[in-house]
Amino acid sequence: MDYLKLDEQLCFPLYVCSKEIIKRYKPFLEQIDLTYTQYIVMMVMWEEKEIQFRDLVNKMYLESNTLSPVLKKLEDKKLIERKKITGNDKNIILSITKKGIELKEEAKLVPMQLGKCLEIKEEDGKTLKEILHRLMQTFN
């Protein structure tokens, strides 16, 4: 086996699939005025309602300097609020706003719309997701 062949790499099909799936999200997310990264942040916010910045960084597998501009745009759109915890300038609490909660209704169609674009059996999708989640756990 030649380990330097592209077809032998695990990372390449993961990279291509990730890129292509995010591309397919784009027209659906444009309808609700979100980028993919903003969308996944909002999914966390819809679930948590309130979360510390450092916990969001860990949950999203992103660096704080990558996440900060995304949060700024969500704040500018009035979807979230950032509050500093008294006595600790580095500890920030993120809260979803009423407008952010209302956006969830519009966003409910996005997963179904995307599902129609992907030619994968439901069972295969579940299996793939389970495998990827196990792989993600090794990164912590």
Model-derived features with residue positions:
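The N-cap/first-turn positions of alpha helices
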Residues: 18, 36-38, 100
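N-terminal leader segment of winged-helix/HTH proteins
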Residues: 1-32
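N-terminal helix-turn-helix DNA-binding core of bacterial DNA-binding proteins
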Residues: 23-63
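Short, locally clustered residues in the helix-turn-helix/winged-helix DNA-binding domain
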Residues: 15, 43-47, 108
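Charged, amphipathic alpha-helical coiled-coil/dimerization segments
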Residues: 72-130
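Pre-recognition alpha-helix immediately N-terminal to the DNA-recognition helix
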Residues: 13, 40-43, 102
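Alpha-helical linker/hinge and terminal dimerization helices associated
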Residues: 17, 21-24, 60, 103-121, ...
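Residues within helix-turn-helix
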Residues: 53-54, 65, 72, 92
